[in-house]
Amino acid sequence: MLLTAPGGTVVQPDGLLVTPSRHVLLEAKGMGRSAFQSEQLSREFACVVRDAGNARPLLLLITPTAPPVPVKGHGRLPVGAAVRLFLVPVLARTSGLNTPLHDLIARIPDTVAWITWNEVQAAVADAHFDAAALPVSVAGTVQRLRDDLLKAIDWHRRS
């Protein structure tokens, strides 16, 4: 859970991956007809840029289909437009982010990326890993995680 400001709006991404060089906020949309909330991408963009520090920020969207993305009350929008849609009011309520609006808007293409569930599934299914180079227990865990992810994507697609 992230906050735009102390006592401010709660931002609840589906995942957060942090390394010394990357700060990745994950937002995964289900296979059904789910839409992003109207301010959601603006909030998540503001939080990932603010919280990245010296790391490179990335807002990674996992979606059922390629953009444009559905935004509640606004139809389907290109990703950049969906981020910009409520960026001004979100920034007014976001503490600790003092970057000028035009600089933030310029950063959207390098900060926001998307991949579809089909592409995730294909990448995982096609990925090769050298099980012989890993301890047996680690190789087994990696294989189980891979298989479980593929099964979960299939299950959600059918649901």
Regions found by a protein language model. Name each.
Residues 1-159:
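Charged, terminal alpha-helix-loop-beta segments
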